[in-house]
Amino acid sequence: MLDLKKWMVATPVVFALSLGAQTTSPERPSAKILHDAAGDTSDNPGKIDTSLSPKIAHKDVRAAMKKVADWELGHSEAIFTQDWTYAPLYSGLLAASATTGDAKYHDAVLKYAEKVNWQLLPGRYDHADDEAIGQSYEALYLEKKDPKRIAALKENLDKVIARERDPKKDLWWWCDALYMAPPTFATMAKITGDRKYLDFLDKEWDLTTEHLYVPADKLYFRDATFLQKTEANGQKLFWSRGNGWVLAGLARTLSVMPNEYPQRAKYVALYKEMADRIAGLQQPSGLWRTGLLDQTAYKEDEISGSAFFTYAMAWGINNGVLDAGKYRPVVEKSWKAMLGHVFEDGRLGSIQPIGAAPGAFGPGSSYVYGVGAFLLAGSEIDKMAGMKGMKR
């Protein structure tokens, strides 16, 4: 039996929710403001940095992480937002500090969380995208158990659980949502010791999977509008970043889901099944294209989907879920290839802009979610460098 009292994180106060949520909500920024803050494309990004070493050694991995994180921090810290686009970046920056020992990345995230008073974006309480930033709030709470750090988030998640279900529409109707929300709910279960968060995410994950996952292909459609769409070669249309969101979401959910949870084995099986399929779709270059099943239709290697895949598989290696002998070469090849898209100033390019399907982009295209995925991947690869049998 799952004993959440043994598993939960000790909490000094049962949240004192009266201290948490603001009584007034600021106006939600316009979609254009949020979109424009997420990244840009440089027509003249300069030269690729050939000095970065692909060796899986602490010194080399951390140098690459710092190069990219420093550029991103200088480029976007002044325009941080609470939007989903930044959620992976904040997680990646926290991971970068933990990996490199440089506190400035962590401190930038903490400073912003304090600036917005640990709030979510207003106006869409049940939208998974707006819950994604909660993952960084939870991570910071686990460092210092100050109830205000998660009070607004907990109130929001409780409201989502209590809401009346719309039988005609899944709550998480697009596959990206499986990164945005489930890890947030799973971590709240860890913090509070309340299994209701796990049971809720389990129910909603099943509904999304029932409607979007194709067991024969071991991949997710982005949403229901893609069920009948095909590539030029006649294959089903499966978006790389969409499946990257899912695989990374599985890794992040499993990282906080207790071993004793009755449904955990289902998530492990799905994670391993998808990892096997995605590893087999890796291109000779080491990366993945935006469309997974028609390589002739999409010519460019893409970073964000590739980085999420790399992060998730490296996590699996480090946690004994994936066979290192099989997956380490996949991860090493991908890491080396991603370094080939870091420019001399630290810009990480070849990141597909915001979208919902395979699409075109330039080499200077850089967006915060792709940078966050790269930093998360680097943090797990750095752990690989410390494993027995790895070259240092």
Regions found by a protein language model. Give the residues of each.
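Bacterial N-terminal signal peptides
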Residues: 10-18
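CBM-like carbohydrate-recognition segments
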Residues: 28-87, 96-115, 119-134, 140-156, ...
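Asp-box/WD-like beta-propeller blade repeats and closely related beta-sheet repeat scaffolds
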Residues: 149-185
